[in-house]
């Protein structure tokens, strides 16, 4: 369906009044805490995992305007969303371990699958992270490094023919974070 071709000669004012339903999401999480063998009442660390289901195809736009042309545009947009995107399952796992004294180390990974129905579009994210933290009763400081590896299909515009009108994007995003907090 060619959404843009049907509306190419129609110009709407720069102000829109619509309602958007964001994708539904459900998460199942689990954690396991383990104790220090020499001090069983003190936790040594934990492992946690999440499985997340996201209904990208369920995103919807609704016009708050009764103008039939505007309503028709949003109906067509919803049709394109429903036929372009799919439901997806994402995975996350992480762990934190108390080292000695007030020091802690953590590591994690996440995988976010492709939201596109068309398997030809390679789109996903893979995240690796690690960090250290120092905590006292009143203060804490955390240092984290996170590397996000992204694959995506970038569409600058949509055409009726689907041949090669998108760009395969691959990228890495390396981030360093420092956090400081005061407990009161």
Predicted feature descriptions by range:
Residues 1-184:
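Outer-membrane beta-barrel porins/channels
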């Amino acid at each position: 369906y060619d959404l843009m071709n049907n509306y190419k000669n129609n110009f709407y004012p720069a102000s829109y009044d619509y309602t958007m339903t964001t994708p539904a999401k459900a998460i199942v999480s689990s954690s396991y805490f383990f104790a220090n063998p020499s001090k069983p009442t003190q936790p040594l660390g934990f492992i946690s995992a999440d499985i997340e289901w996201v209904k990208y195809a369920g995103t919807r736009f609704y016009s708050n305007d009764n103008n039939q042309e505007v309503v028709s545009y949003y109906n067509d947009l919803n049709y394109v969303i429903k036929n372009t995107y799919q439901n997806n399952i994402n995975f996350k796992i992480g762990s934190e371990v108390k080292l000695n004294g007030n020091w802690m180390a953590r590591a994690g990974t996440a995988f976010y699958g492709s939201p596109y129905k068309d398997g030809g579009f390679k789109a996903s994210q893979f995240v690796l992270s690690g960090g250290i933290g120092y905590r006292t009763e009143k203060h804490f400081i955390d240092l984290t490094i996170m590397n996000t590896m992204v694959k995506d299909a970038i569409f600058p515009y949509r055409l009726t023919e689907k041949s090669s009108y998108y760009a395969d994007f691959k990228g890495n995003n390396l981030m360093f974070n420092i956090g400081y907090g005061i407990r009161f």
